[in-house]
Amino acid sequence: MTKNIQVLFVCLGNICRSPMAEAVFRNEVEKAGLEARFDTIDSCGTGAWHVGNRPDPRTLEVLKKNGIHTKHLARKLSTSDFKNFDYIFAMDSSNLRNINRVKPQGSRAKVMLFGEYASPGVSKIVDDPYYGGSDGFGDCYIQLVDFSQNFLKSIA
């Protein structure tokens, strides 16, 4: 029997990109009928500025517009995440460096850019939309759907 998969999405503050990735991925898993393959789908940030907060209203707006809801509250990456998750997906190169900097030796988690699952022509880096307008959040959504679908195909 195949072991169930645990996936963690990581950005800087855990209020924009990674909670959107978590919600989008969960939605894509449900649409594909693959819920039984996953034990945990979660997200966190490398920083602790927003711990306990709901996602950015613009993240929630994009999710709602696409029929996706989340109850996520921001949290910070912890050492235990490296033993509890199979995949730790970073949204950008800076996040990836920060994750690898604190990754314990012997960690079982595969740490990588989620964008490694990008379709040709789609940027592998999910830019932080926090300081921009609503368009950036829509762009993130499009990327995250693409990455999610491609990752799910890769494990089928």
Curated annotation (Swiss-Prot):
Annotated GO biological process: signaling
Entry annotation: catalytic residues: 11, 17, 128
Pfam families linked: LMWPc (PF01451)
Locations listed in the record: Cytoplasm
Any single Gene Ontology cellular-component annotation: nucleus
Swiss-Prot/TrEMBL keywords: Cytoplasm, Hydrolase, Protein phosphatase
EC number assigned by the record: 3.1.3.48, 3.1.3.2
GO molecular-function terms, A-Z: acid phosphatase activity; non-membrane spanning protein tyrosine phosphatase activity; protein tyrosine phosphatase activity
CDD domains, alphabetized: LMWPTP
Enzymatic reactions: O-phospho-L-tyrosyl-[protein] + H2O = L-tyrosyl-[protein] + phosphate; a phosphate monoester + H2O = an alcohol + phosphate
Family under the similarity heading: Belongs to the low molecular weight phosphotyrosine protein phosphatase family.
Role: May contribute to dephosphorylation of 'Tyr-15' of cdc2.
UniProt name for this protein: Low molecular weight phosphotyrosine protein phosphatase
Lineage: Eukaryota, Fungi, Dikarya, Ascomycota, Taphrinomycotina
This protein's encoding gene: stp1
